[in-house]
Amino acid sequence: MARILITGSNRGLGAALLRAAKSAGQTPIGTTRDGRDQTIALTLDDPDAIVAQLVEIGPLDMLVNNAGMITPERQSPLDMNFAGFAHSLTVNSIAPLAVPQAVLPRLRESAAPKILTISSQMAWMGYRKADRIAYHASKAAVNKVMQGLATAPEPEGIPEALVDPGGVQTDMGGAEAEEDPDEVSRGILAIAERLTIRDTGKFFRFTGEDRAF
C-alpha cells in the first residue's frame, strides 16, 4: 500500500487522482490551500516556504505534482498581465521543483519511490496558438525543469516523469473537454505503477504512450 502525496487535491484532476488512489487500495495524502477535508495545507505562492509546510509529511512512496493554475485573465502576447504571468510561473513551474526537494528525504526511505508531474498537451513546443500563453509557457518550463530534476536522483534509482492528461473535463479544462477525469486518473496511476528508472525524464500521454516535448 503506497503512500502518495497529491498536490491540489480539492477539485478537478487532483480530486479524481485522490479517488482513484483510494479505489486502488493506496493511501493518498492530498493538499489544499487551506487544509480542508483532512488534507495538508500547502500554498505554492512562495516556493521557499514549501519545506516548512511539508515537514510533517511522514513516510512517502510517491509524489504526484498536480496543483496548477490557468492565470492571469489577460495573457495575450499583446495584452499581458505580467505580474500574473510571473505568478503563474511561480505556481506552475517553480513550485513543482520545490515540492520534490522538500519531500525527497522521505521518498529516499521508500523501497520504490517515484515522482510524477502533471504537465499539459499545450506544453508541446509545436503548439503555436497564442491563447493562454502564460499557462502554455509555464507548462513548457515545468517540462524542462522536471527533465533536469530527473537526472539528479537517477543514480539513486528514483524515476521522475511527466504526464500529459489531455483536455480534461474540469473547471480548468471546461465541460467541452474530451477526457473524463476519472479515466485520466486511472491512466496516470497505471503509468506510476509501471514506472522504472529506464523511464526517468520521459513525457507520457495519460494513456501510456511516449510523447514529444
List the predicted regions and their residue ranges.
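Conserved glycine-rich Rossmann-like NAD(P)H-binding loop of the short-chain dehydrogenase/reductase
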Residues: 24-35
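Catalytic loop of short-chain dehydrogenase/reductase
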Residues: 69, 76-89, 94-97, 108, ...
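C-terminal helical subdomain
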Residues: 155, 162-165, 174-213
